[in-house]
A protein has these predicted regions:
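Cell-envelope and extracellular/periplasmic
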Residues: 18-502
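Bacterial Sec-dependent N-terminal signal peptides
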Residues: 1-20
């Protein structure tokens, strides 16, 4: 990032003239910590006249002077730096021009911190705001304006560093007031969304490190709309607007992780449109994710992890099961991609989540971030249950093996109807899309296995867990029952058209 500050000193020009700063900290800026828990803050620039001068830098940590250095200007150029430490304290920088015993303030930056930087992006569930999101912290930061699809205009470019928010001051109307509108298409300065704000809160409280989150989500966006088009960064695209903000924040090479919640808009089998925008075709998702991941790693050089949320049954078209399975496969393909389920999260309305539900996103993903970036060792299992094998264990018996102990919810009652767990598995004879229903006599969970007793001698080739989005033969959105982790109570990852081994 190169910001230019022209400082005209209102004293006789024979002493001072004009100084240009090409590097200087800004108010509320977060500097990314290095492996030693430090960051270097640099002032550099040049002076336009020929009078010899001295500069003095003063650094205050929580208002206590901790560093002071005088520097001579040589050949009209100067550079001076100071090391700051990561932690829950704030720095103030004051740069002075010195002539004799007199000091003249050139630049001041308040509330500067050192910590970690993350990105959240995707479609609407990546950036939902809520009037209930009132938490604010001096150590939770963001940069610029979350704009969605709107052009990043000149006024937006004036918005620099500030305190992150999960709220939306410009949102209004009955749906907003009652919690059914998350400000999906509103511009929000320093907006990080409900669960982004909750994640920042949990990280700050647990690890005592400041956090910056930049959210680039766009409501209803396809994976294509999150990709880098064209090859150069453009403010006309979601990718470009996000990359611009990250670059201007000086974080391009220091993003630790990207959290990606997206896929509902890619559940179509052929060309379709929503509000005039092209929808995504599910069969292209895996290849497109490969491209997106490569572009992220090319633009954000320091990227270490990608946290991918498997989508919940909800808004979208008829191939949600396929997208969820593709997301499973993506997580297995890449060592630096971690997947998290959204099953068994409360408050799903058929497309989005309640305030409480979004907070659960942050609660689930926190232990993974703590493990990956803070070296936390956890005796508990912190990942969602994932199927590792399905096989015939008897003539009329199929065993499903998971990577951890699980338990089953027996049923979910909706509108007076009990939807039984045993009816949420679907089978196929020829490995086409599983659609054979109600062939299970009983289910039993035992440690990390589910034992399925069939009521037929028919041999099946594959099975799926949970329907595409509706309960079978209804228009009621699926809300459970769920397979959940026995110890962590995290909903299992769904699976689709998985081969049943003999």
């Amino acid at each position: 990032m190169r910001n230019y500050f022209l400082i005209f000193l209102f004293v006789p020009l024979v002493f001072f003239g004009q100084i240009t700063l090409d590097k200087a900290p800004e108010d509320f800026q977060l500097f990314p910590r290095d492996a030693s828990n430090n960051a270097s803050v640099v002032f550099s620039g040049k002076i336009s006249d020929d009078v010899d001068k001295e500069l003095k830098l003063k650094v205050f940590k929580d208002d206590l002077l901790v560093f002071e250095k005088t520097l001579e200007i040589i050949n009209k150029k100067f550079e001076i730096s100071s090391i700051i430490k990561a932690g829950l304290f704030q720095y103030r920088f004051e740069l002075y021009s010195k002539k004799g015993e007199n000091e003249y303030l050139l630049h001041k930056a308040n509330n500067v911190v050192c910590g970690d930087a993350y990105i959240i992006t995707g479609q609407s569930n990546s950036h939902a705001s809520s009037k209930k999101s009132t938490y604010s912290s001096s150590f939770a930061r963001s940069f610029g304006v979350k704009t969605g699809y709107e052009t990043y205009n000149q006024d937006d470019k004036k918005v620099k560093w500030g305190l992150a928010t999960g709220n939306c001051k410009t949102c209004k109307g009955e749906r907003w007031e009652t919690g059914y509108d998350g400000g999906w298409f509103e511009k929000v300065s320093h907006g990080v969304g409900v669960w982004g704000m909750e994640l920042a809160k949990l990280l700050i409280e647990k690890h005592q490190i400041p956090v910056s989150i930049i959210n680039g989500g766009s409501g209803s966006s396809t994976i294509e709309e999150n990709m880098l088009y064209p090859e150069k960064i453009s403010l006309e695209t979601s990718f470009g607007r996000l990359a611009y903000r990250v670059d201007q924040a000086g974080l391009k090479n220091n993003i630790k992780a990207i959290f990606y919640h997206q896929g509902e808009s890619d559940t179509y089998s052929d060309l379709a449109f929503f509000k005039g925008r092209k929808r995504g075709i599910y069969s292209n998702y895996s290849e497109n994710f490969d491209i997106l991941k490569n572009d992220w790693q090319r633009v954000y050089k320091g990227l270490k992890k990608i946290y991918l949320f498997q989508i919940h049954p909800g808004c979208g078209s008829d191939f949600q099961s396929e997208i969820r399975e593709i997301q499973n496969e993506i997580s297995k393909k890449y060592d630096n991609v971690e997947i998290m389920s959204t099953t068994a999260i409360v408050g799903h309305d058929g497309c989005h989540f309640s305030y409480k539900g979004y907070k659960e996103f942050a609660k689930r993903i926190l232990p993974l971030v703590s493990r990956d970036f803070f070296g936390e060792r956890n005796d508990k299992i912190i990942t969602p249950p994932q199927l590792i094998n399905a096989y015939y264990s008897g003539k009329n018996e199929i065993t499903l093996t998971f990577d951890q102990p699980i338990e089953l919810e027996e049923y979910y009652e909706l509108k007076g109807v009990r939807h039984l767990m045993k009816n949420q598995f679907f089978f196929s004879i020829d490995q086409e899309k599983p659609s054979i229903y109600s062939v299970i006599n009983r289910l039993k969970a035992k440690n990390n296995e589910i034992i399925i007793s069939l009521n037929t001698d028919q041999k099946y080739s594959s099975l799926s867990y949970i329907p595409n989005k509706y309960y079978f033969n209804t228009k009621d959105m699926y809300k459970g029952p769920w397979i959940i982790g026995l110890t962590n109570k995290i909903g299992a990852l769904t699976f689709s058209n998985v081969k049943i081994n003999n």
